[in-house]
Structure formats: C-alpha cells, structure tokens
Amino acid sequence: MKLPIYLDYSATTPVDPRVAQKMSECLLMDGNFGNPASRSHVFGWKAEEAVENARRQVAELVNADPREIVWTSGATESDNLAIKGVAHFYSGKGKHIITSKIEHKAVLDTCRQLEREGFEVTYLEPGEDGLITPAMVEAALRDDTILVSVMHVNNEIGTINDIAAIGELTRSRGVLFHVDAAQSTGKVEIDLDKLKVDLMSFSAHKTYGPKGIGALYVRRKPRVRIEGQMHGGGHERGMRSGTLATHQIVGMGEAFRIAREEMAQESAHVLALRDRFFAQIDGLEELYINGSMTSRVPHNLNVSFNYVEGESLIMALKDLAVSSGSACTSASLEPSYVLRALGRNDELAHSSIRFTFGRFTTEEEIDYAAQKVVEAVSKLRELSPLWDMYKEGVDLSQVEWQAH
C-alpha cells in the first residue's frame, strides 16, 4: 500500500490508464494531431472523426443526441455558458433566475455577475438534508423567471436532487432548466431523453478523464437558444469558438465510454468501501453526517467531528488526502457555505471532513484510513478543554466566554 492515500475523488480523479493511452495517440507527428477544423486534408478529417466519435460517446452516457453536445474547457465554463448564454438571449422575456445556496461557485459567481448586470436571482435554501425540492422551486417561480439552475449531485455532501421532478415543473411553466452534473456522470443514471432538462454541464476530470475539457448539453427539441460567450472562429455551431483540443476530447469520450460500461459494478464497489469505512469510525462520539444518507451518491461521506477543528484534523491525517469543503474553496478558512446553508453551526461546519472514494480505492486503504481517523480524533479531543467540559456535562451553548 502506497502512502499518502487518496480519498479526495470529488476534487479530481486520476486519469484512467485506458484514457491516457487514447489521448497519447493524438499528440505526435505519427498520431492524430491535426486540427479538426482543417477541411482541406486528411489530418483534419481524421481529427474531426475522432472528435465526433468522442461526442457520440459523451452523448451515449446521458442518452442525448450527439448534436446536443458542445465542447468547453470544463464544467466551470459550461455553467458560465449555460447561465449567461440563456440570460443574455432571453433577457427580453424576463430577468429572474432561480438557483440554490449550495451550488458550486461556478454557478453562484456567474449569478452574482448577472445580478451586477441587472438580473434578479433567488437563492433557495436547502432543507437540513441538503436537498432542493420541487416545492421550493415552485414557490420561487415568477412570471418573469427565465431560468432555474439546480445541481444534480452536490460536490461537498454528495446529495442527489430530484432533477426529474424539478424538470417536469419547469417545463410545465415554460422556464428553462440548467443542471450542473459535474459530480454525477458515472455515478448516477442520466437519461436526457426522459428528463425535462434543457442544459446540463459535464466535466471530464471528475470521471477519470483529463482536466481542461468539459461539455455542455444544449437541448434541440424543444430548441434552446444561448448566446455564445467566447467569440472567434464560430466553432461548435457558434456557441463556443476555439480550436478543439483533439487529445482532451478523445480522453473525455473514452472516460465517458468506460463510465457507461462500468458504472453499475463501480458504484457497488464504492458503496461497499464507504460502508466499510463508516462502520469503523461510527463508534466515535459526537459524529454527525452532513446531508441525506438515502439520497446520496455512494462515493461521498461528509462527516463533522464535534470538538475537533477540521484544519487540525487534516494536519493530523497527513497520510490521507482528504478535504474540508470543496477543492475550489478549501484554501479559505471560512466554514463551508454548503454546511452553513444546511443549518450547521460554525463549530460543526469547521469540524467537517469530506471523504470521497473511487475506482482505485482498496479495502486495505479504507481500513488504514479509518484507523488513522479514529486515532487522530481521539487524540485531538484529549487535548481539547471543550471536550473535557462536554464530558463533564457542561452545556457549552450556555457558557459565556470572557473576551480578552
């Protein structure tokens, strides 16, 4: 077993060796290195063929038409393109957008930017289970609402929103529906033929593909229009200009092909690992699971250890690669805005750790990690005067702390 142990699969995944092999065939002089937009020679034709094959592979995972897949640089760009693209195109119809407080920053900050441009955004608050319900969305809908953006799987707590029910609601009201699915490909079944979803963002690097490539699903029937945000040569039917990176795209296609074929067995494998891990740490007192355990992907376990500071716990677990909050915001020492939105107090939000498991995690690693967590939590609590007070029966919420 190699140390450190990687348990941060929701931050990124390693590229699957089969994906790396396909990518390496699109780089060198004797490989498929051409520009897919070069129409006058065989190098361009071959590259275009590889790109279209990958487009089909991505579409097949989510049961979409390949013509509905637009290549982007990742889910952040896809979120920006979907939300700004719809807002700018349909602003004559209305200027109201609905999203939730627990979306990824790529959605929240895009909405903040639109607010500066004069749009109005309603931010829904989840229940303490971390879920956004159709009833919450319905209550926020207005005559001038043009877009609802709700994530499929939350990146911090792994909860799964009922996008099928939300889609039925938005379609019946003539409102476009965007879903950030960066964390759900290869984890949850997605059928865009059945779902009433108009736009969906995808990322390769959360699904054992390379970083720097993603896609946006844009529905054709009923047709969804978006205004391109990247101007240039008019690639991707004008929705996203820029030379297509054949090697990245081929990597994403292969990653999504593997996800489609191996999803069922992989989810079972990961669920068994998570249950094994949780069974070994469940004996710890004052342990709180963040988010619903029933409507949740098997890959995620987000736990708060009361009376332990999350940052010091991460330092104590130097052989484990885990995170507090999402990778994009874990550098800030603010408590997770997702956990705050669930109603967790600052202490519990600060003491949370996200363990995310994946394709290459082994039982041996799980057992080692669980043992280290139990040891570290117990040791840090021994050093904590708050823990002593709690054990003595002091109600810490009633204590008045003296300011110095």
Swiss-Prot record:
The modification N6-(pyridoxal phosphate)lysine is found at residue 206. Pfam families: Aminotran_5. The active site is at 328 (cysteine persulfide intermediate). The keyword Cytoplasm applies. Pathway: Cofactor biosynthesis; iron-sulfur cluster biosynthesis. Its EC number is 2.8.1.7. Its cofactor is pyridoxal 5'-phosphate. It is found in: Cytoplasm. One of its GO terms (cellular component) is L-cysteine desulfurase complex. GO terms for molecular function: 2 iron, 2 sulfur cluster binding; cysteine desulfurase activity; metal ion binding; pyridoxal phosphate binding. GO terms for biological process: [2Fe-2S] cluster assembly. Master enzyme that delivers sulfur to a number of partners involved in Fe-S cluster assembly, tRNA modification or cofactor biosynthesis. Catalyzes the removal of elemental sulfur atoms from cysteine to produce alanine. Functions as a sulfur delivery protein for Fe-S cluster synthesis onto IscU, an Fe-S scaffold assembly protein, as well as other S acceptor proteins. This is Cysteine desulfurase IscS. It comes from Pseudomonas paraeruginosa (strain DSM 24068 / PA7) (Pseudomonas aeruginosa (strain PA7)).
